[in-house]
Amino acid sequence: FVVKAGEEEYLPYGYDTLVAEAEKNDRLYRAYECKNALSIGYTYDSYIPEEKYAKMSTVEKQQALLQGVILSDSTVPETIPEFNDREVPYKLVTGSGCREKDGKLIVTKENAQAKLVFDGLDECETYLITEGVDYEALSPRELISDKKWNKMTLYEQKKVQYENSTWRYWKESQKAYIDVTGQFLDKTISIFTDKYNAYSGRSDFLCNTGYSVKGKKSITLTFENTGVYSYKNMKVVCQPIENIESQTTKLRAESLENVEIKNHELTGNISVSKDKVLVISLPYSKGFQAYVDGQKTELKQANTMYMALELKKGTHEIRITYCTPYLKAGLVLTCAGLLCYICVVLVYKKKRGSKKG
């Protein structure tokens, strides 16, 4: 994980070993290694069905991935994951130019702030989770309260009315940004509405405000744009890290060894003390083919994006090859098309020669 020197607070939990430094554009960057990192091939002794995993929250999913492999089905036992995340109550304190009404935050001044005040837990990562977020811009007239409007001169009112006539709701309501600050960290939530040409439908966000030994006390939201920010749910969740080391140690205990990758092929060997599932940290694709002890073996899609092999107790030789899907069929069809073209040209030339004769 690479960060600018002096900004180590952006490092996720566990990235505490400095392995390299480099300078670019007069800035020093540092690369840190995670002590709990898993190898390219690690093993599980239990699984979690995909349909159950799909119903979990984002915070639950990251905990589940350390307790069981995610598969549609498996021969290893199913496990029921345990979760230790805690939602903590908070008080929302709004600043100048920002007010809360009917579950919405109405911002009438750029860079207005709201603060979530809470008692966070020690030795935790603290998350701000927002669901169903949407944004609507406010017109120049809507930014002015009735009390202030009545005090304005006729000229000032006419000026605002003119600005209002040229203002376009669909254009101004396309996107907005919220800066999230948790003690030292500063991150940004980018909101793109259905009026934006690159709208993706995303309205739920999880912002990790970082790990801290002492519990955090507040999270500050800074609204770069004026407008109405609505949300269905907003919560602060603390994720203790007490189980991470023991869980990753278990996954690393029996891993793929003597790994070699060359010529579209990965090889290695592994010994497992009981029936297990070996996860290969390569993106799943139908182009991969696996062989265990020389026997062709089914590769399963695991943990959403990776590949997995079911292994029996014992020592095994693993070989995984890759060939681009439909590459051979494509070559055959290309050659066939080329032959057809040559035949057409030859027939055409022969007919043309016959006419001249």
Q: Residues of each region from the PLM?
A:
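Intrinsic-disorder/low-complexity, polar/charged segments
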Residues: 51-53, 57, 240, 262
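A cross-kingdom signal targeting lumenal/periplasmic-facing segments of multi-pass membrane
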Residues: 1-50, 58-63, 67, 71-89, ...
